[in-house]
């Protein structure tokens, strides 16, 4: 581990910077180096363990794609000893145009080497999708808890 992130916020900023720059090594420096880590990208299977996460970001960064710009807002933070839980709203722009809004949970653990990411889980924001899809339901959908 080359970077010693002094706060979970610093590690989170490095995560989004690495996403924007498609920088695999910077991305991997954010993650905790063990097999308890997990990452869930929207519409994708869960990646478990550092090797799977590396392979997932490697594939994402290798594909020719326009640069994404992230605006993080609506942040909620909770620190419980050596674990920090952040929930955020990710607005993703390509070429200055808003293309997606995600709700994400980022979990960090404090280590002797600084704060490291333990979990990233992102899902589309429901209200944003409904606006974009422009449809109405004939009958209200049942409320389900998972």
Give the residues covered by each predicted segment:
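A beta-strand edge to alpha-helix "cap/lid" segment located at domain peripheries
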Residues: 2-26, 37-146
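Helix-to-beta-strand junctions that scaffold the AdoMet/dcAdoMet cofactor pocket
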Residues: 32
């Amino acid at each position: 581990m080359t970077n010693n992130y002094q706060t979970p916020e610093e590690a989170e900023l490095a995560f989004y910077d690495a996403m924007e720059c498609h920088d695999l090594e910077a991305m991997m420096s954010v993650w905790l180096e063990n097999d308890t880590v997990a990452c869930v990208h929207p519409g994708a299977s869960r990646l478990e363990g550092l090797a799977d996460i590396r392979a997932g970001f490697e594939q994402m960064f290798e594909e020719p794609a326009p640069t994404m710009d992230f605006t993080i807002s609506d942040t909620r933070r909770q620190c419980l000893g050596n674990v920090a839980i952040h929930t955020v709203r990710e607005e993703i722009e390509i070429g200055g145009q808003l293309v997606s809004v995600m709700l994400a949970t980022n979990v960090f653990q404090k280590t002797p080497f600084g704060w490291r990411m333990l979990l990233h889980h992102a899902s589309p924001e429901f209200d944003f999708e409904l606006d974009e899809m422009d449809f109405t339901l004939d009958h209200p959908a049942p409320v389900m808890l998972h």
